[in-house]
Amino acid sequence: MTSLHLKKFRRIVVKVGSSLLIDSDAGEVRAAWLSALADDIAGLHGEGRDVLIVSSGSIALGRSKLKLPRGPLKLEESQAAAAVGQIALARIWSKVLGDHGIGAGQILVTLQDTEERRRYLNARSTIAKLLDWRAVPVINENDTVATNEIRYGDNDRLAARVATMASADLLILLSDIDGLYDAPPHLNPDAKLIPVVKRVTADIEAMAGSAASELSRGGMQTKIEAAKIATTAGTHMLIASGKIEHPLRAVMDGGRCTWFMTPANPVTARKRWIAGSLEPKGTLTIDAGAVAALRAGKSLLPAGVIRVDGQFARGDAVIVRGPNTHEIGRGLVAYDAVDAEKIKGRSSCDAAQILGISGRAEMIHRDDLVVGGPRGGAG
């Protein structure tokens, strides 16, 4: 499918499940396979693309190192096994990426980190900085503190949330099956692979049977749920086989997979959400120079703010008005109302000294800002 190629995407999230990473019989990492995957990732990285990894495996690795018997684990046993396995998992990814001169940064998240706005922004900022430094974030659910009531439950949906958080334009779910079929292929030899899903409909959801393995918590149903999350937020998704060596290279060479399409890009979808779905908690009035900068696609700096109104927290939506009080746009503010009042009209360097912390240089980053009206003018 020539119109869909990995080279078209600038920021890619790759999800690797436990059943691919760990040899279930030996309880060890599939080293040769992982090395081949790291080669693929290094190739994308070397072309200037941002790559993020969502990796399962901490519980399975911990269970192996602790020599725990097969079978279900109690919650506290899973949490303790994850504590051991997370160290091993981080070391493994650091080694295979380090062999290519790429730094790896471990990020452990919980459900609340994507549901609670301030924690979401903190996680997103960390991911953005790692990518700025050309490191590869390696992300997993923090199974040591997650409970049955407050967890993602599988890394397919976690990967979709991470893709949304990172404004990725492609999510790749490596699986033990090479895509979505119109019937269970292990039961029906005539089952046909569906190469492209333009929209997740009830019929598509009905095709997702139960295909979970002992090591992983995910199946095709969770992958369809992930597709709904990702495509709604503006991220394309594909399911491809991870059982082969160099699975990403295989996709690039036209290998079998299923693409889930999105009608919008991540930035467009995100900005539509900011503009239309969030209730503004306050107002920032800015000078004419800042209006021109915003309409030229720049971020809003503290120096351009002349008035702060309302009670808002970091990450809340605010209205941005020009000096004549006309609305210029809306955005997610990087400081709460108290700190914004302290640093309005000041340089970013002065703002850091005033607050006693080295926070974000921008009052509102351009990725968090929706500007309306024609370019130019004072608003």
Swiss-Prot record:
PANTHER family for this protein: GLUTAMATE 5-KINASE, ISOPENTENYL PHOSPHATE KINASE
Broad class of where this protein is predominantly found: cytoplasm
Domain spans labelled PUA: 281-358
Positions that bind substrate: S56, D143, N155
Family matches, as Pfam families: AA_kinase (PF00696), PUA (PF01472)
Catalyses which reaction(s): L-glutamate + ATP = L-glutamyl 5-phosphate + ADP
Official protein name in the record: Glutamate 5-kinase
EC annotation from Swiss-Prot or TrEMBL: 2.7.2.11
Gene Ontology biological process terms from the UniProt entry: L-proline biosynthetic process
Source organism of the structure: Nitrobacter hamburgensis (strain DSM 10229 / NCIMB 13809 / X14)
A GO MF label: ATP binding
NCBIfam families according to UniProt: proB (TIGR01027)
Keywords: Amino-acid biosynthesis, ATP-binding, Cytoplasm, Kinase, Nucleotide-binding, Proline biosynthesis, Transferase
Binding site for ATP: K15, S175, D176
One cellular component (GO) term of this entry: cytosol
Location in the cell: Cytoplasm
Family to which this protein belongs: Belongs to the glutamate 5-kinase family.
Pathway note: Amino-acid biosynthesis; L-proline biosynthesis; L-glutamate 5-semialdehyde from L-glutamate: step 1/2
The protein's role, per its UniProt record: Catalyzes the transfer of a phosphate group to glutamate to form L-glutamate 5-phosphate.
